[in-house]
Amino acid sequence: MKLIKNIILGTFALTGSLAVTSCSGLLDTENLYEANLDSYYSNKTEIDLAMSGVYNSMFVDGVLSEEHLIASLFSDLLLAGGGPDDTNSQNLDAFLSNTEDIHVDLWKETYNGVYCANAVIEAIPNADFTADFTSEDDIEDYMNSSLGEAYFMRAFYMFRAAKIFGGMPLIPTTDADREVARATIPETYQFIATDLLKAIEYLPEENINSISLNDYGHANIWVAKSFLARVYMYYTGYMTNIEKIATDELPYDEGSVTKSDVIAHLEDVINNSGHGLVSDFRNLWPYSYVNESNSIYNPDYVAGDAILPWAADNNLAWVGQDGIHSTLGTGNNEVIFALRFGLGNWDYDGGTGQKYSNRMPLYMGVRDHSMIPFGQGWGWCSVHPTFYNGWSDTDTRKAGSVLTLGDADQGTGSWVAGKSNQETTLMNKKYTTLQHNGDDGVLGMFYYIYNMNNADPMQLWAAQDFYYMRYADVLLMHSELTETADGLNKVRERAGLEATAYSLEAIKTERMYEFAFEGVRWFDLVRWGDVETSNNYYSSPITVSNAGVEASYSVTYRAETKGLSAIPQSEIRLSNGIYSQNPGW
């Protein structure tokens, strides 16, 4: 019996048309910055529609504009992989670019999102909510919550872009001059920090157990506090270790955020949010559900059969991806903020609807193979074998993060070498294609879970959320800032490891293993300055297979880039000389 008929993604659901058209008149039109806001967003219905537009810019069209994929290719833990035609990803992995606009969609969606957030921030004080609520208190609560979300998302977009491009043009209002120079890095982060503090001021302090399923995925105060810590640590680290301007403060409009301020915010998350660690790290990832899904949807299922024996042997059970009240699994209290993906459709959003499905499993899936339960992908981002070989087998995260090819216990016994470049027999298990048999044949697990109906499912069926922030990060950030081992050892205990004394090196090692392939490692290396030291896997020669031909390869970093990528050349031309290209590009 089919238990799940559709996917719930909150009010910005992508299975319908709301999010795709949600900034109508504002997104992707010639009048993007010229709409008359006096006639827009005057009541709750219109504000909710506008808020969908704010979140919609989390999705970008070009896959090499995905923050987490850029970070994966820049990371020392992953190789480019792929096939002979995947030159753009292979050049990025080598810190080269032969495409002048490789990240242009990230730049565009940053300012689409900023504009929509500006529109909400400006409209709310003038909107009339008397027909929508029965009391002034309810109106005030709604206004504050909506303002808090808009301020957070504006900060989120600017931070996402600043980590890739550095200083960004600041557009604080809908009618602000857009022909402005890029702000400095301190000015950009001052803008981000100010917005995060406003979000914290406006958002209600609500335990996650009281957040409804329909509201899951929206920003809340715990999201804002957690991201304030991440922004603080990235900014102070970048300025100190890359720019060589030592600082332990994050500027905002009325002063500076200090380390003690950030620690207090993290302790509020730890003590009051309701977030926690799920009991088994491996249950965070959808492969922990593939046996159960197969038992539900496969008409030929025989009781006791497991298509992923390793998961059955370890009694894995997915916690789901819809928060504490997840529609599947036991409930996920660890994920604090996620990019909520649905089932893509080529017809959405002017033919760019693939972006509404998670392309990481597609691009990082095993190339040119269709196995059960690990299906076909493009073979990007093979795992660095030196990193893997140095990882203790007693750490449950090792087998929980890395897919070993040619291993029957892992469901990859039929794998044949020589299908992709930079093969290492090791792939990302957290984000990979999952499939099994069902009424419609061997198709994606999410195809069956969410009752997909699409003519091109293989490229569109990865409805797996991308985790931007987990509670484990809160614990490890707190340990790093306080220089104490409590949070560190809670994370280690879950992984089956013994307690250890605090040291920065212990934190670095733990973060490397805990967040492998989650788009975190690269930014950690940058903020610690470890991109410029030997404390990484760059320039470590390894043997790989390129379509069956053995070769030597080493992951590359170029220090002259200062940890940044190239801004789109088209934006430099459009600026008429106001913008200049980043160093090293």
List each language-model region with its residue ranges.
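Short coil/linker segments at helix-helix boundaries
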Residues: 131-140, 167-186, 238-264
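Flexible, polar/acidic helix-loop-strand segments at domain edges
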Residues: 383-469
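An aromatic- and glycine-enriched ligand-binding surface/loop that stacks and positions planar moieties
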Residues: 24-87, 218, 222-225, 230-422
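Extracellular structured ligand-interaction cores
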Residues: 145, 152, 167, 219-226, ...
